[in-house]
């Protein structure tokens, strides 16, 4: 007794119902023929028909199976249900109304049925109504889809027809063609239609019955069987192995959450070694076979070839091929194809498609059996390229046809039946035939690498054009090919494309010879399978050998093959399939005879692949075993190279086994050699001490080793052995080499210590040559110091050089000492970049290596001096009050204006978020101001005169004339130290350039709000803060100078003060710079005559006097301390002897030749070693100024020619001679020549000054022109923006984004899933995901709705839930389900005719996958609804007016959004430029980046670089080129909120749409962004490139959106709990730790907030203070979009909230 007996009975009943019942039912025919919408009115007639039909069923066969009355009634009820199903689905098939109409009818029918006497058990209820409505849609969709073309099906929305697609996929193509489609003859033409009976019966019987009642029928039959049969009980044997028993693992986790899942995971882990390895499918093996380098697949296709003169014959119709096949499936598809053709109009598009369809059928059985049609199709191939199987077409005509369709509009394109087919045709050149000429199989390629394929036309027409190279083309992933054979060769390593057609050999017509057991063997066969494997094995695999030179590699040694097969060696052997000749045996039993020819060929290819892999495995083992003399690393390289070369997948375990089993165990062990006795013993060598003899005299140049110079005498000795012929050379090293090696050991440990040691090394050993090289003072060897010297500075006070070396290739934050200051490094780097742009000192702006290195060195110096100076002063035992009093007294610093503060530097200083305490925020602001002071100190030391004169100015206060007018008031009587070794001070006004720099920088810091200004301040520039900065700077300057004088050996102080005082004594006191500034900025002079005198006092210039008339300056004698020699008694008093001061150069100071005396002791007198004069002979009355003057000029003349240029010494006859003037080194010149030299030097100086002024003027003009261009561009953007938005002030962001989305739709499709997320993502429609039922119970499979379905609705201020809600209606259960509109949490539900029900304690949420349009509008926001409750409560303590508080918060939200939009545009531009200029910088030695977001952006960049390697970035590649100039011009525009409709509400959330509406600046920036993106798309003419660019931009939008948005995480319970623990109060955290829920802890905390005042004070203060803090953060964080410190995309500080 079997269940299928009942199945056959039900199947027969349904057939009878269709053929005999419905056709005679008047009610059914009336509903169908009259297109009745309301079929409820036929309810009584339908009930009567079903009842009569069921009663008419013959139950005889059923009673034979079931003799129990109860069971019989149950079976009859089941039959009655499915008769009703069939009846109503038949109505559904013919129903002309909408789905909604059918649903309403079924619901009404079910309600009325409650009072009916006719009963069908379990039918007229909600569940069955849902099934009928579901299958109503499936029937309607099936009727459309099955009659569509493939390309028309691709235009369908997968979400709309998902159920139908699943239904059809479950049936399969063969079933659909054989049963659901049928061919009918209409007007003597074959027409394909839907078979309604089979379709409905498939649903009723196959979907409903088998999934519902069939199990019940089985149980009934099983009960009957059990009553009749007897049973035999058996014992079950259970394994004693605990690891194989899942129940043992279940016991471990008994009582725990997810016990079953955990037990299964542990069970699988324990039994992992017993898992069966995955077996490759036949399809995979076929792909892997043709991907092998040694094999070339042969494909049969035809080529469409363009010819300008080709024209379509409009009169000719399609070739109609009759249906003659015995295969119903093929007949249906063929008839359907012709039917689709006939639907098309007789247009040019139809002619193109009909022609192609006819050619595709060239090898179909219907054509082969009809010679007339063969000749018709052959006409298409009758052209000069017929030997290539090419048909001619006119590409330009086809493009014109497509353009005409496009011009009709988007809707016309979508409704056009052949538009997609045309697009498919013109974008491809090669097309597969639908059938095969002889033998072949179809393969879908899924290899990522392209495959070279040989066309079958080369073989088919080999005798035509045989001297040409073979025709090949490339197959790519996703392509389908008709594989008709395989080819191998040529064997001379030439590419396949270079093989001629005449060199093609049939594998069945050749003999091959190979070596077997050292004997030649010759074979030939008709079995291509066997011959192909023999060639692969003996020609390719057995010839693999190892080559160790010039590099380790594997190659094919074809020498023997070439000798044995001279006729085929350089040729290509092809094998075309023939299943009648190509027989093969399988290792396992497979009945493949019942398979089709295509399946047999696939099995055969899979066998070939297995055999080749087996050959390769054996060959690899043989290579390892025969090369045990190689090293282990070479064997590992061998395995790696072999596997890569032959595409072997060898895992790590298999490699290990290969090495152990076939190498280490086979490797012969070297035997120990034991010497025999009585052999001659060779004595060991004996050490003999060396005699130091034979001195050598060596001449060493102390200045320039390359040129002969007077030398000192050194003696060196060789060491000799007993053998006089063997001399052991000594390798002596200078001490500087060993010291240098020791210094380099510190290089990667402590950079500052390294620099300090290098500085000491330079001082100890270096000597500069005339060629500007650096040599050792001791040995004359060149020292590697140039890169250390070029970054350093010379300290005039200590007469020492101090290096400032910073390694180029290592980021500063990766150096050990600076790893904990990552954020500080980036903020200071951003600050340098920002201030450089503001002040127009562009030597520190840019991305080239030199600029980046210089900026990095500056950052390092700033951090070093901050750390050092703060550390030193924090250890001092002095209070701040005492220190202020001391500074005020000593340096006249106003202690009320001094903000110097000493602190420990750490990254928390830059924490300006509202979560920080008020005290912490205040301290951080003060610390940040102090960092600015250090920045000013280091920054101005990098400026030279020309850079100072070119600094930016403005007409308000930032110019020289305002400085000259008010400078005295700012600087007053402030004093600075003139050196570090004494307490000598000077008024700061003696250094006018320093004062100007301090004034200008303080002005810009205040103007751009980089300097924190507490309190309300509405002025653009407040001079008070300039005075604060200046007084604080003087404190810092003097403090560093004093501490450097005390700690003289500290490298950081030494480097800082050397730069400070070098600038102080040169640039800062240069009045000429002030004069140049006055000339350059004369436009700011408010008086017509200009300002004649400088109000800032300067030190008087030292007057000069001619040599002939010197001035006498009276100077008192000075005391020189002198100490007597003692006989043991210590004298504490010195003898005071007065010595007269020498006021001029006399015979006491200078020799007659003008040089200074070099006095040495000579008995009781002193003697000059240069001129020989004695101290007793000189009187001081002989003036030698003139001699000294010419002596100095003579020294200059030894470096420069008379004309003023440097000498160019060359070797001439053994002497150094200048090639310019002919003079030799150290030559003495006469006075006329020296006077002439001085005149020429003065001329050169004058010329240099003129060039400098000219360059300054040109740069000023360039800067002004650049500013004008920027202003014009901004004006143009604002004008275009206003024009596009019809001069609207607010609410302009939506149309801007819509413009970009429209462009995307053009190239990506309007309603297409972009497939970039786990849930669908569309351009315009949001997606709603529901993964739970109405009461919060999780669903196995989520339900997905699209926005355009209008299933998810929105309602404001719901009357029951008292908030805005989303809701949907579950028609199946008649339940409305409600969600909170802000949090998306499940609130409750309402059943029909019942009260509302709240769902408590649930973690169920509505998920929204926003569209690209919505994400574009939400860029920069954490969430769509912004929670402002905390900010509102905190502000309410000082802002009593509710409206003012609310409006201030919205203002801050807008400001924050403006800053984030700037950073978003930065990210857009930088990402696009990175893709354009992508370079893969990660090598094997570098550590990979583990941060997920960094991996995401790296993958995105790498992905689109590989997809679109070459593309244009706007016109002339200048998209975003001017963004850096525009960036700072977008600022918050004040809004009068009282003039708007915006008012605070009880709901403490602000919709991001409200912020967007009133955010004018962000709208303008988004307009700029969209304009640049569109320009990038338009600058690339190729459509495929535009499509790829659009897809790339979509993914960039997704990436940036995900950086800011937290919607994905905010409703995850674990994240919420973590957030509450981190940010909650102590009471709340304590409750959470004790196991309380989040809701209870929030309620208690809210209660505490209401009863106790909040101790957290607001960080903003007054409204203006918020603006300042906002700008401070913006300026501190803002970076150039190509800055080098933001290489890791995950570190985005824009995510930090900055809102009150």
Curated annotation (Swiss-Prot):
One cellular component term from this protein's GO annotations in UniProt: membrane
Transmembrane segments: 986-1006
Keywords associated with the record: Coiled coil, Host membrane, Membrane, Transmembrane, Transmembrane helix, Virion
Principal place of residence: host cell
Coiled-coil portions: 1246-1278, 1657-1684
Localisation: Host membrane; Virion
Region feature (Disordered): 1650-1700
Compositionally biased region (Acidic residues): 1651-1700
Topological type in the membrane: Single-pass membrane protein
Protein name per the record: Uncharacterized protein R472
Annotated organism of origin: Acanthamoeba polyphaga mimivirus
């Amino acid at each position: 007794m079997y269940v299928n007996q009942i199945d056959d009975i039900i199947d027969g009943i349904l057939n009878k119902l269709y053929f005999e019942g419905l056709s005679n039912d008047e009610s059914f025919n009336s509903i169908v023929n009259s297109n009745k919408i309301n079929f409820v009115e036929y309810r009584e007639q339908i009930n009567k028909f079903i009842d009569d039909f069921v009663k008419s069923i013959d139950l005889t066969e059923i009673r034979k199976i079931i003799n129990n009355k109860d069971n019989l009634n149950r079976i009859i009820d089941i039959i009655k249900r499915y008769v009703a199903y069939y009846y109503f689905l038949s109505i559904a098939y013919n129903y002309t109304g909408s789905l909604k109409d059918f649903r309403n009818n079924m619901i009404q029918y079910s309600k009325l049925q409650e009072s009916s006497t006719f009963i069908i058990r379990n039918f007229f209820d909600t569940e069955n109504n849902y099934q009928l409505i579901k299958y109503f849609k499936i029937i309607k969709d099936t009727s459309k889809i099955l009659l569509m073309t493939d390309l028309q099906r691709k235009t369908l929305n997968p979400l709309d027809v998902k159920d139908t697609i699943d239904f059809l996929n479950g049936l399969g193509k063969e079933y659909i063609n054989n049963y659901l489609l049928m061919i009918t003859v209409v007007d003597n033409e074959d027409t394909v239609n839907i078979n309604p009976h089979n379709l409905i019966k498939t649903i009723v019987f196959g979907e409903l019955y088998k999934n519902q009642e069939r199990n019940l029928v089985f149980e009934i039959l099983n009960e009957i069987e059990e009553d009749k049969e007897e049973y035999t009980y058996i014992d079950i044997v259970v394994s004693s192995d605990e690891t194989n028993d899942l129940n043992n693992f279940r016991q471990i986790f008994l009582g725990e959450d997810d016990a079953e899942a955990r037990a299964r995971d542990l069970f699988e882990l324990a039994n992992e070694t017993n898992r069966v390895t995955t077996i490759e499918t036949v399809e995979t093996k076929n792909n892997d076979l043709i991907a092998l380098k040694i094999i070339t697949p042969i494909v049969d296709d035809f080529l469409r070839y363009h010819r300008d003169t080709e024209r379509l014959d409009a009169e000719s119709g399609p070739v109609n091929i009759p249906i003659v096949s015995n295969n119903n499936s093929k007949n249906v598809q063929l008839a359907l194809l012709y039917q689709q053709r006939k639907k098309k109009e007789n247009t040019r598009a139809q002619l193109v498609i009909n022609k192609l369809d006819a050619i595709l059928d060239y090898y179909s059985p219907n054509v082969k059996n009809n010679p007339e049609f063969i000749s018709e199709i052959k006409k298409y191939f009758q052209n000069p390229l017929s030997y290539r199987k090419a048909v001619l077409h006119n590409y330009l005509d086809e493009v014109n046809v497509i353009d005409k369709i496009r011009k009709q509009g988007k809707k016309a394109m979508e409704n056009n039946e052949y538009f997609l087919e045309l697009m498919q045709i013109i974008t491809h050149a090669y097309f597969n035939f639908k059938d095969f000429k002889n033998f072949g199989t179809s393969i879908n390629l899924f290899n990522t690498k392209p495959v070279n394929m040989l066309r079958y036309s080369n073989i088919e027409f080999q005798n035509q054009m045989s001297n040409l190279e073979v025709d090949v083309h490339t197959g790519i992933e996703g392509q389908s090919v008709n594989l008709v054979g395989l080819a191998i060769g040529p064997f001379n390593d030439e590419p396949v494309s270079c093989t001629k057609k005449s060199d093609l050999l049939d594998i069945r017509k050749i003999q091959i010879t190979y070596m077997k057991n050292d004997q030649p063997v010759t074979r030939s066969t008709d079995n291509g399978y066997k011959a192909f494997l023999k060639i692969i094995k003996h020609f390719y695999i057995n010839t693999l050998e190892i080559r160790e030179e010039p590099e380790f590699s594997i190659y094919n040694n074809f020498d023997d093959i070439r000798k044995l097969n001279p006729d085929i060696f350089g040729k290509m052997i092809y094998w075309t399939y023939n299943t009648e000749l190509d027989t093969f045996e399988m290792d396992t039993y497979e009945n493949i005879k019942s398979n089709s020819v295509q399946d047999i060929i696939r099995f055969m290819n899979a066998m070939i692949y297995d055999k080749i892999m087996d050959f390769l495995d054996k060959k690899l083992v043989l290579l390892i075993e025969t090369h045990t003399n190689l090293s282990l690393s070479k064997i590992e390289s061998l395995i790696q190279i072999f596997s890569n070369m032959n595409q072997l997948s060898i895992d790590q375990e298999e490699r290990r086994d290969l090495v152990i089993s076939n190498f280490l165990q086979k490797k012969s062990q070297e035997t120990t050699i034991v010497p025999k006795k009585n052999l001659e013993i060779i004595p060991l060598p004996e050490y003999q001490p060396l005699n130091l003899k034979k001195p050598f005299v060596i001449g060493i140049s102390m200045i320039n080793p390359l040129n002969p110079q007077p030398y000192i005498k050194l003696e060196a000795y060789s060491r000799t052995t007993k053998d006089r012929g063997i001399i052991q050379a000594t390798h002596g090293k200078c001490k500087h080499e060993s010291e240098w090696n020791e210094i380099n050991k510190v290089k990667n440990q402590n950079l500052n210590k390294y620099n300090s040691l290098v500085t000491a090394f330079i001082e100890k050993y270096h000597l500069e040559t005339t060629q500007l090289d650096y040599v050792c003072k001791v040995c004359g060897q060149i020292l590697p110091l140039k890169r250390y010297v070029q970054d350093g500075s010379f300290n005039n006070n200590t007469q020492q050089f101090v290096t400032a070396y910073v390694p180029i290739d290592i980021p500063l934050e990766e150096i050990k000492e600076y790893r904990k200051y990552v954020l500080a490094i980036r903020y200071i780097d951003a600050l340098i970049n920002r201030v450089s742009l503001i002040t127009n000192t562009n030597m520190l702006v840019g991305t080239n290596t030199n600029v980046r290195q210089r900026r990095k060195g500056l950052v390092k110096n700033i951090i070093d001096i901050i750390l050092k100076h703060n550390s030193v002063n924090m250890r001092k035992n002095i209070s701040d009050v005492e220190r202020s009093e001391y500074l005020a007294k000593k340096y006249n610093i106003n202690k009320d204006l001094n903000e110097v503060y000493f602190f420990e530097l750490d990254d928390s200083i830059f924490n300006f978020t509202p979560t920080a305490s008020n005290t912490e925020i205040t301290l951080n602001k003060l610390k940040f101001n102090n960092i600015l002071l250090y920045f000013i100190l280091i920054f101005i030391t990098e400026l030279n005169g020309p850079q100072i004169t070119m600094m930016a100015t403005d007409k308000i206060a930032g110019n020289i004339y305002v400085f000259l007018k008010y400078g005295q008031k700012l600087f007053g009587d402030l004093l600075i130290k003139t050196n570090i070794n004494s307490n000598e001070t000077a008024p700061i006004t003696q250094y006018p350039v320093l004062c100007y720099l301090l004034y200008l920088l303080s002005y810009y810091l205040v103007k751009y709000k980089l300097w924190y200004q507490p309190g309300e301040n509405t002025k653009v520039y407040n001079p008070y803060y300039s005075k604060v900065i200046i007084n604080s700077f003087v404190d810092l300057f003097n403090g560093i100078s004093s501490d450097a004088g005390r700690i003289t050996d500290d490298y950081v102080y030494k480097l800082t003060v050397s730069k400070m005082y070098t600038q102080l004594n040169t640039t800062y006191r240069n009045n000429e710079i002030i004069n140049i500034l006055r000339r350059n900025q004369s436009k700011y002079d408010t008086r017509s005559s200009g300002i004649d005198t400088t109000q800032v006092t300067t030190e008087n210039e030292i007057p000069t006097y001619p040599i002939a008339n010197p001035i006498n300056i009276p100077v008192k004698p000075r005391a020189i301390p002198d100490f007597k020699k003692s006989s043991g008694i210590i004298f504490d008093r010195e003898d005071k002897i007065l010595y007269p001061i020498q006021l001029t150069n006399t015979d006491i100071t200078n020799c007659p030749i003008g040089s200074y005396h070099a006095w040495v002791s000579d008995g009781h007198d002193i003697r000059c070693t240069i001129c020989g004069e004695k101290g007793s002979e000189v009187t001081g009355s002989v003036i030698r100024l003139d001699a000294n003057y010419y002596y100095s000029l003579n020294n200059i003349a030894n470096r420069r020619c008379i004309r003023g240029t440097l000498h160019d010494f060359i070797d001439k006859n053994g002497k150094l001679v200048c090639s310019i003037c002919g003079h030799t080194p150290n030559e003495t010149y006469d006075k006329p020549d020296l006077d002439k030299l001085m005149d020429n030097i003065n001329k050169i100086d004058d010329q240099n000054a003129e060039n400098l002024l000219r360059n300054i003027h040109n740069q000023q003009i360039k800067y002004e022109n650049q500013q004008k261009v920027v202003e014009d561009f901004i004006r143009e953007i604002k004008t275009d923006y206003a024009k596009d938005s019809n001069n609207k002030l607010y609410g302009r962001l939506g149309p801007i984004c819509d413009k970009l989305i429209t462009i995307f739709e053009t190239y990506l499709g309007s309603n297409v899933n972009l497939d970039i997320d786990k849930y669908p993502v569309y351009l315009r429609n949001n997606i709603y995901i529901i993964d739970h039922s109405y009461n919060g119970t999780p669903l196995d499979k989520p339900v997905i709705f699209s926005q355009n379905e209008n299933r998810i609705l929105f309602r404001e201020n719901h009357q029951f839930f008292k908030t805005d809600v989303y809701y949907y209606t579950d028609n199946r259960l008649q339940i409305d389900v409600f969600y909170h509109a802000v949090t998306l949490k499940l609130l409750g539900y309402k059943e029909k005719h019942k009260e509302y029900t709240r769902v408590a304690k649930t973690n169920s949420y509505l998920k929204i996958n926003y569209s690209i349009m919505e994400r574009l509008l939400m860029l920069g926001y954490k969430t769509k609804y912004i929670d402002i409750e905390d900010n509102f409560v905190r502000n309410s303590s000082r802002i009593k007016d509710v409206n003012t508080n609310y409006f201030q918060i919205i203002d801050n939200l807008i400001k924050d959004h403006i800053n984030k939009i700037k950073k978003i545009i930065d990210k857009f531009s930088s990402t696009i430029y990175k893709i354009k200029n992508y370079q893969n910088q990660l090598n094997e030695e570098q550590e990979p980046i583990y941060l997920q977001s960094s991996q995401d952006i790296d993958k995105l960049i790498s992905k689109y670089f590989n997809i679109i390697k070459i593309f244009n970035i706007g016109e002339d590649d200048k998209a975003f080129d001017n963004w850096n100039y525009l960036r700072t011009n977008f600022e918050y525009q004040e809004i009068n909120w009282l003039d708007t409709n915006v008012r605070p509400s009880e709901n403490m959330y602000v919709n991001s749409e409200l912020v967007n509406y009133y955010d004018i600046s962000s709208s303008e920036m988004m307009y700029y962004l969209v304009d640049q993106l569109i320009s990038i798309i338009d600058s690339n003419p190729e459509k495929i490139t535009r499509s790829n660019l659009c897809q790339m931009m979509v993914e960039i939008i997704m990436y940036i959106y995900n950086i800011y948005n937290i919607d994905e995480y905010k409703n995850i319970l674990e994240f919420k709990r973590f957030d509450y623990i981190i940010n909650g109060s102590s009471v709340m955290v304590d409750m959470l730790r004790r196991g309380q829920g989040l809701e209870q802890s929030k309620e208690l905390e809210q209660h505490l907030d209401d009863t106790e005042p909040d101790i957290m004070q607001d960080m903003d203060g007054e409204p203006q203070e918020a603006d300042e803090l906002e700008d401070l953060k913006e300026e501190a964080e803002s970076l150039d979009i190509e800055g080098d410190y933001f290489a890791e995309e995950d570190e985005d500080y824009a995510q930090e909230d900055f809102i009150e």
